[in-house]
């Protein structure tokens, strides 16, 4: 069983990388070359493949047509309602911001990937426009970014603040690049005025915090590639203004959508309203821990039956 969480072969090392200006460098090129060599060997040896979205493993089908007969399942990173119930029964302290101070705390929780900087820049440019056009709303806004480096060790590098400084909005931004533990992340999400969800320039991208964000019962501002599975999920589970969704595409990039992001951001800061009636709770059941575990178990059963049949 291969859990193909992130594509091994993509834009990294080809058009983007760890070099100056986000361009490919020697390390990213070598990483891509190694992935191109190892990937076919690994997927050929796998009896089944799981991924967070069907678009992720469909890339493998495009590269290796013979893989189409291999059992595959899309198993997104879901959320468990019981975790939120337990958290609300036993509140944890919030040492990062005061949810009752009258400010609008818009919180992002999760790693900021290299291909996500274009989206980040568009969001911060929208915040800069808010400062120019609606200084009253800008003064109320607080943008918090948690776990952006995905590192748990002290001294994790800043990823958001340098961009915020360059765009002149650092006075509204705080960043805690170190990764939060699970319950702290849920605490931030449940106590935020609203939750910010940002995607990547890659079509397949899906957010690991999407379902916890929906279960947090807070308004959402989501900025994603139009082909991301996140867009379909949000539009099928939560209506505006509870979930405000701005999309971009391959031609109409995130930078071209700053005005649309500004409109939604301004409306959100002016009235960060959450309406539980706007959420299709029944549709969220299929992304609970129990439902996703059942989906994985069904795939394992399928592999087991095929293996036994092959041994007979």
Where do the language-model regions lie?
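Nucleotide-activated donor-binding/catalytic signature segment of Leloir-type glycosyltransferases, i.e.
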Residues: 140, 144-149, 154-179
């Amino acid at each position: 069983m291969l859990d193909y969480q992130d594509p091994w072969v993509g834009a990294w090392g080809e058009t983007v990388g760890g070099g100056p200006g986000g361009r490919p460098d020697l390390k990213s090129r070598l990483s891509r070359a190694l992935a191109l060599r190892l990937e076919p060997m690994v997927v050929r040896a796998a009896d089944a493949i799981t991924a967070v979205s069907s678009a992720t493993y469909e890339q493998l089908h495009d590269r290796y047509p013979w893989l189409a007969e291999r059992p595959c399942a899309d198993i997104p990173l879901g959320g468990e309602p019981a975790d939120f119930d337990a958290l609300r029964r036993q509140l944890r302290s919030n040492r990062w911001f005061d949810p009752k101070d009258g400010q609008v705390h818009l919180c992002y929780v999760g790693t900021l990937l290299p291909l996500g900087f274009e989206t980040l820049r568009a969001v911060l440019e929208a915040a800069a426009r808010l400062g120019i056009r609606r200084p009253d709303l800008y003064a109320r806004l607080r943008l918090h970014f948690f776990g952006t480096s995905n590192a748990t060790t002290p001294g994790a590098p800043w990823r958001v603040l340098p961009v915020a400084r360059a765009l002149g909005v650092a006075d509204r931004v705080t960043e805690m690049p170190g990764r939060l533990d699970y319950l702290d992340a849920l605490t931030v999400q449940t106590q935020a005025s609203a939750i910010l969800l940002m995607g990547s320039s890659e079509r397949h991208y899906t957010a690991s915090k999407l379902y916890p964000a929906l279960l947090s019962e807070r308004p959402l501002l989501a900025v994603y590639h139009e082909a991301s599975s996140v867009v379909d999920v949000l539009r099928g589970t939560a209506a505006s203004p509870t979930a405000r969704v701005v999309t971009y595409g391959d031609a109409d990039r995130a930078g071209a959508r700053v005005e649309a992001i500004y409109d939604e951001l301004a409306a959100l800061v002016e009235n960060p309203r959450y309406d539980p009636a706007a959420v299709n709770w029944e549709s969220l059941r299929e992304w609970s821990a129990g439902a996703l575990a059942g989906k994985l178990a069904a795939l394992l059963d399928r592999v087991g039956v095929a293996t036994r049949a092959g041994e007979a």
